[in-house]
């Protein structure tokens, strides 16, 4: 599965400021920047982010997904500290 497709699915279905996907061979990770999602419990965050991607788990296009969530403010701070683009 292409990284851009994962990003686009999440952008189209969730209220997020930014999303970044990485990985290959059905093992992916996403960084989701959203005040709304970051405010949820960790379990709710996972459920919310997994939901639009579930069809791709069923087909095997995605086997594993790691999730990191940030508020907009925390992402700005961490990105500056870690020199993310």
Curated annotation (Swiss-Prot):
Database matches in InterPro entries: BolA, BolA-like_sf, BolA/IbaG_stress_morph_reg
Top-level lineage group: Bacteria
Tell me the Pfam families matching this sequence.
BolA (PF01722)
Note the Gene3D superfamilies from the entry.
BolA-like
Q: Which family does it belong to?
A: Belongs to the BolA/IbaG family.
Stated name of the protein: Uncharacterized protein HI_1082
Q: What is the lineage of its organism?
A: Bacteria, Pseudomonadati, Pseudomonadota, Gammaproteobacteria, Pasteurellales
């Amino acid at each position: 599965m292409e990284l851009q497709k994962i990003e686009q699915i999440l952008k189209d279905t969730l209220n997020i400021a930014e999303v970044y996907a990485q990985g290959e061979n059905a093992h992916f990770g996403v960084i989701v920047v959203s005040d709304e999602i970051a405010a949820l419990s960790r379990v709710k965050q996972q459920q919310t982010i997994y939901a639009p991607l579930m069809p791709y788990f069923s087909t095997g296009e995605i086997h594993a997904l790691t999730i990191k969530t940030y508020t907009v403010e925390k992402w700005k701070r961490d990105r500056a500290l870690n020199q993310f683009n």
